[in-house]
């Protein structure tokens, strides 16, 4: 059994390699890593601020020296050591506080797209929390313009299509829910790339049903429902997300494995789970990789997608997460291609876009196996 020795050092500047390097490299053949590196992909659960690379975090911290976020890479590695989920949220919010101008927003967004493109991610639904920026004084119109400018540049220059999920920061209460809903549904502000509406932050003490009126408004405005649920609480939170918030996909859903009826429900209705294995270890939502419920999900026939969540903070990226999945599920190239196509199916791309990306995955896999 593989265990993460405390303290977990999930930050990308981790000395001696990333968390997933330590866990996966000895057990996954190098040619499979090479296959993963070139595999065309879609990513559905990746956070905007949580994707800030150590270089960008250091640059932003230097721009805003009143922040407590360190600029030194060694100190940043220590800073990105999380004791539990609550501590992760505390650190995450301190990085959010570095995003103070529209220029910061555009820089971050484009650099996130650049990193996705490096991993052959053709399409990504990036979770953005506009409330966290507008409450810090960024003009809401300027914020929308910044993410849209970066989105268009990324598609033209990098070949990566970005779409947005606006999420409610649950720890900020119903005020944030109202503001996020307004920004997501006001046609004068709503960005062209917005496709979905979510709910993040702590689950404990933040019951999902209280957000039903806001999700109802977002769904009525044509947005898809993709709340986090069952990451740090039990399967009842997933049921609430489904029954009260109209969830079409579940962010994490880790505890779903504890409820056979829920697994059956997810499988029969083809409701995808956005699985983020390394994140679950780093935040202590799951004790060890060997105990991760991804195996139970696939055995039950649940549509599983692989995602990186907050990759630099957890010392991972999407390629590493596919390697984790290969190790846990004993997958070969065709199995990994199947996971990539799961993400395409579960995405909110138009049918033509889904068909193109699925065909590209098939062509890449066939070419690889024939070589």
Regions found by a protein language model. Give the residues of each.
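Metal-cofactor-binding active-site regions of metalloenzymes
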Residues: 3-5, 14-223, 232-237, 244-249, ...
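Targeting/processing segments of secretory and organellar proteins
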Residues: 10-12
């Amino acid at each position: 059994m593989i265990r993460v020795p405390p303290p977990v050092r999930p930050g990308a500047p981790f000395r001696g390699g990333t968390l997933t390097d330590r866990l996966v490299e000895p057990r996954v053949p190098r040619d499979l890593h090479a296959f993963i590196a070139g595999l065309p992909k879609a990513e559905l659960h990746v956070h905007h601020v949580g994707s800030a690379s150590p270089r960008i975090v250091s640059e932003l911290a230097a721009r805003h020296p009143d922040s407590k976020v360190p600029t030194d890479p060694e100190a940043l590695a220590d800073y990105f050591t999380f004791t539990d989920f609550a501590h992760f949220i505390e650190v995450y919010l301190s990085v959010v506080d570095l995003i103070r101008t529209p220029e910061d927003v555009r820089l971050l967004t484009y650099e996130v797209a650049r990193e996705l493109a490096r991993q052959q991610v053709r399409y990504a639904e990036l979770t953005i929390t506009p409330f966290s920026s507008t409450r810090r004084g960024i003009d809401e119109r300027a914020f929308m313009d910044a993410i849209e400018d970066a989105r268009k540049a990324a598609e033209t220059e990098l070949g990566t299509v970005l779409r947005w999920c606006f999420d409610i920061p649950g720890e900020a209460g119903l005020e944030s829910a109202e503001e996020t809903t307004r920004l997501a549904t006001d046609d004068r502000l709503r960005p062209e790339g917005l496709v979905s509406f979510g709910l993040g932050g702590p689950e404990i003490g933040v019951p999902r049903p209280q957000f039903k009126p806001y999700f109802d408004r977002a769904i009525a405005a044509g947005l898809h429902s993709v709340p986090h649920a069952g990451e740090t609480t039990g399967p009842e939170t997933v049921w609430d997300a489904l029954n009260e918030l109209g969830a079409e996909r579940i962010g994490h859903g880790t505890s779903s494995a504890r409820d056979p009826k829920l697994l059956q429900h997810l499988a029969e209705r083809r409701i995808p789970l956005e699985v983020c294995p390394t994140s679950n270890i780093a935040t202590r939502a799951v004790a060890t990789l060997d105990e991760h419920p991804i195996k139970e999900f696939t055995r039950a026939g649940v549509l599983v997608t692989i995602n990186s969540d907050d990759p630099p903070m957890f010392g991972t990226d999407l390629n590493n997460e596919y390697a984790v999945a290969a190790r846990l599920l004993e997958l070969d190239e065709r199995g990994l291609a199947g996971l990539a196509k799961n993400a395409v199916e579960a995405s909110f791309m138009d049918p033509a876009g889904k068909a193109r990306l699925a065909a590209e995955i098939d062509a890449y896999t066939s070419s690889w196996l024939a070589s």
